[in-house]
């Protein structure tokens, strides 16, 4: 079998892989990139971008529900087939445009997931490929669940392609993926049950705000079952049945659809990493600050699959840039964890940046906690919103803001203001001196820094 050689071979065509590949080819290196799925990566084809297109329709319905009998006569109906057609106008062009862009740059494409043969070679499309450097940017995949019948469970890919809104659905797992789709389907008329092994939903987010969000979803018909361990899924004639254990008892719940939203894991199982001496664990490919494998100097990993990442698109792009730069110029750029906000796109939205309350109190001797329910404030009342709350964390010694957690209809935007404040080491007084538009959610942020918890 003839061996083809490249300077750089990239595995994965999402933002991280593309960014690294482009940096290398623009420096004159020969580059190839492979992907077993459509080119463009998760976010733009089957993740955050199409999700936001769909969820905005749930937002419109929810906004109308909140104002029903206050001027809105009737909550609008959503034509789901038309919505899906609109979504496809965003996702369908991505693979074609991505491939054209890469080809125009001189990058060769492979449409299969490769397997490492040894430290210097891999096999893809029946061909043996050697490279001076390999870049692994394969992202995340849904976590496999290991109980009877789990193989019939559908994932977020299926939710994004639903031909119609099911009458009933069960989600196994209440992380951000599960909560976002739970909100979307329940708002559009689906009877939703959330089954969670933990004590609450959204474990990484602030408990005070998560409780309020959970209460809103419950008021809108979502049933939460916590401390529940799934044990079996069965296909029935008209529906599916999930069996779970809770408080020592075996219980069941039935629905037309049952989804696996129990988290995502690095997509590395099928790469045969052990053949190439590439070390990895549950966090992904183990890398140093240069995004270089700790066990193989000619391998770099970036994006969700690296051990230094979070499942956030801006971070993937940054890591791809650093990996590409270091391949071209030698290890000169180090990855330093930037301040990255995160958002759960429910209604209300839950957003977070900086330290949690627990993290702040473990890092600083004294922490001021500004915490409150803002549901009686003007901006919430004019929307007839069911919840609006916040928690802001301040280092008492320096008076600098070190963490912010928001629950509101505009949290995905207003959290960026706190991101800017923390990045610029702003104190509470600095922040209060700023002038924002009024009346706006941005202006509310200053009022959050008045009364300590």
Question: Predicted segment positions?
Answer:
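Beta1/beta-strand and adjacent pyrophosphate-binding region of the FAD-binding site
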Residues: 2-14, 165-172
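Glycine-rich dinucleotide-binding loop and its adjacent helix/turn
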Residues: 48, 138-191, 195, 223-224, ...
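FAD-site-proximal beta/loop scaffold in flavoenzymes
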Residues: 150-166, 252-329
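A conserved FAD-binding loop/helix module that cradles the flavin
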Residues: 302-359, 438-453
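Short hydrophobic core segments
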Residues: 9-11, 114, 129-139, 172, ...
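Glycine-rich flavin
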Residues: 2-6, 22-165, 193, 198-202, ...
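Flexible, glycine-rich terminal cap/loop adjacent to redox cofactors
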Residues: 9-16, 20-37, 49, 53-60, ...
């Amino acid at each position: 079998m003839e061996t083809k050689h490249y300077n750089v071979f990239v595995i994965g065509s999402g933002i991280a892989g593309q960014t690294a590949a482009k940096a290398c080819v623009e420096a004159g290196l020969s580059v190839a990139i492979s992907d077993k799925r459509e080119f463009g990566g998760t976010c733009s084809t089957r993740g955050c971008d199409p999700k936001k297109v769909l969820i905005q329709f749930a937002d419109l319905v929810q906004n109308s529900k909140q104002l029903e009998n206050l001027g809105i006569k009737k909550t609008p109906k959503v034509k789901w087939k038309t919505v899906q057609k609109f979504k496809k106008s965003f996702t369908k062009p991505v693979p074609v445009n991505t491939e054209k862009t890469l080809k125009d740059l001189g990058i060769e494409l492979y449409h299969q997931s490769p397997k490492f043969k040894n430290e210097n070679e891999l096999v893809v499309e029946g061909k043996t490929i050697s490279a001076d450097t390999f870049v692994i940017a394969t992202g995340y995949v849904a976590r496999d669940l290991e109980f009877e019948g789990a193989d019939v469970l559908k994932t977020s890919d299926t939710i994004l392609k639903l031909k119609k809104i099911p009458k009933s659905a069960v989600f196994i797992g209440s992380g951000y993926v599960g909560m976002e789709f739970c909100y979307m389907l329940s708002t559009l008329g689906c009877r939703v049950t959330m089954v969670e092994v933990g004590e609450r939903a959204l474990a990484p987010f602030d408990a005070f705000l998560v409780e309020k969000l959970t209460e809103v979803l419950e008021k809108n018909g979502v049933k939460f079952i916590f401390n529940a361990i799934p044990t079996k899924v069965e296909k029935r004639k008209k529906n599916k049945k999930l069996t779970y254990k809770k408080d020592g008892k075996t219980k069941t719940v039935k629905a037309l659809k049952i989804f696996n939203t129990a988290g995502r894991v690095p997509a590395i199982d099928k790469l045969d990493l052990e053949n190439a001496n590439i070390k990895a664990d549950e966090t992904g490919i183990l890398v140093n600050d240069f995004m270089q494998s700790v066990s193989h100097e000619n391998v770099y990993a970036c994006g969700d699959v690296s051990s230094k990442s979070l499942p956030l698109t801006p971070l993937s792009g940054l890591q791809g840039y650093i990996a590409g730069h270091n391949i071209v110029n030698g290890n000169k750029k180090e990855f330093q964890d930037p301040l990255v906000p995160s958002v759960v796109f429910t209604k209300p939205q839950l957003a977070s940046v900086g330290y949690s309350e627990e993290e702040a109190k473990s890092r600083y001797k004294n922490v001021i906690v500004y915490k409150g329910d803002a549901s009686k404030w003007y901006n919430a009342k004019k929307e007839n919103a069911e919840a609006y709350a916040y928690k802001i964390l301040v280092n008492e010694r320096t008076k600098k803001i070190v963490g912010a957690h928001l629950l509101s209809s505009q949290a995905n935007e207003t959290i960026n203001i706190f991101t800017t404040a923390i990045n610029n080491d702003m104190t509470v007084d600095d922040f209060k001196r700023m002038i924002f538009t009024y009346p706006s959610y941005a202006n509310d942020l200053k009022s959050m820094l008045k009364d300590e918890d």
